[in-house]
Amino acid sequence: MTISLTLRRTYNDHPRPEDDDKFWSIDCDGCYVGSLVLHQGPSDTPPDWRWNFHMHPGRHGNGAREGMSDCGIAPTRDAALPDIRRAMERYLEFIGPEGWAAHVAHMEWLKARKEATRKRENRA
């Protein structure tokens, strides 16, 4: 299975512009699937990059967390990317086309709900 993974900035209007490169969304074939964030631990340790998936594959995801990794840590953003790809490929294989369709439908529902809320707020 060939997938297209893309990183995009999570915040376009971050209150601290110097933090813009610390928060990324992970898209798979154009659909949001997770986050990649620069994490600063204790001051005596270097920061690391932490990623995790936010998937909603319905019943097709039952047992996914026990069977595979849906999160990880890497020393650099570039080092995290191959791990994210491997984990995403395994996750998609586990949930199958039905699980992926359930996730895409869930994300479309969230987008529609957000848009409806935005329209309601603009009328008030």
Task: Please provide the spans of the model-predicted regions.
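Short N-terminal "domain-start" leader segments
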Residues: 1-50, 81-82, 89-90, 97, ...
